[in-house]
Amino acid sequence: MAVGAVVVVADGVGEEQIMKTKIAMFSVSLAAGIALALLPATLLAAPTVYPTADAAATALVDAVQKDDKAALAKVLGPDWKTFVPAEGIDREDVDAFLAAYKTNHKIAEGGGVSRLEVGNAGWTLPIPIVKSGTGYTFDLKAGHDEIIARQIGRNELDTQQALLAYYDAQRDYAATDHNGDKVLEYAQKFLSTPGKTDGLYWDSKEGEPESPLGPLFAAHTQKAGAEGYQGYHYRILTAQGTSAPGGAYDYVVGGRMRNGFAAIAYPVHYGETGVMSFMISHDGIVFEKDLGKNGAAIAQAMKTFDPDDSWKEDDELAKGE
C-alpha cells in the first residue's frame, strides 16, 4: 500500500476506527517522517496544479483509494517515491483514513494555506495546499516541515510518558527483594543480566513474576548507538546534585541503589526526532530543557540528577496530579 503512506504520516485522525489502528499508524508515520527529513529540497519535483484546493484534495484521496501510483505521481510530483515509503503500509491504515474522510471532510483555511481536514476531531493532512498564479498545488517542502514538527511533538510527549513509566517501574521493582539479601533497592540498569532479575526487565517464564518494564522499551533503551525508543535515548542516573530536592547525595550505598533513582532522556537526532531533553527522579516530576545540538554529549556525560533553574518543571506531569 505505497499510496497510503501519504495518509499516515501524521497523528491519529481521532475517529473510533482510526484509534483502533493508532499504534500501527504511528510506526508508519515515524518511518515516513524520518525518510522525508533526509530528503534534499532540490529533489522535490513540481506536482500537478489544480483549479481549486478541493480539486487537489479530491485527486489525492482518489489516488489513495485506488492505490494508483501513477495518479499519486501526478498529484504530488514524479519524485513522490523518494519521500513516501513504498513498503510496509497496511491496508487497514488506508481504510481508516478513508473512513474518516467519508464521515466528514472539508478544506480548512488558515495561515495563508489550505489543508484537507478529515473526521470530526480536526485532524489535517500535514501536506498543505497552496495557491499560486496558476492554481493550487501540494507544498511538499512545507509538508516536510510539518511532518517533522508533528513527529517531534509526538516523540516528546511519548518520552515524558515513558519516564513516568520508568518511575512506576522503579517503585514496583523496589517493592520486592530480588536477590534474597533482605534489602529493598532500585534497579541500576534497564535490562537484567540473563538468568537474573537485577534490571527493570527480564524474560519471565510461565509462573514467574512479570518484570516491571516492557521488553520493547527496555531493549531499545539499552542500544546506545541505535535508533533509541520513540526517537530518544535513556540513561539511569545514580546520584543527584545540589539543585535537586534534598541536596546532593549518592543513590547507591554499598553497591545497592537504595536512596533514590533518576533518569534522563535525550533525542537520538536533535531537531529530527526531538528537541527537548527530559529528566525524572524518585519525586516523580518531569523536567525539560533544550540542551542544543550537543545535547547527546551533554546528556551522556551527566552523572547526577541536578535540575537547576534552566530546567523547566512540568507540573501537569507530576505523579499523583
What are these language model-derived features?
Residues 114-157, 161-164, 168, 285-289:
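Short beta-strand edge/turn micro-motifs at domain boundaries
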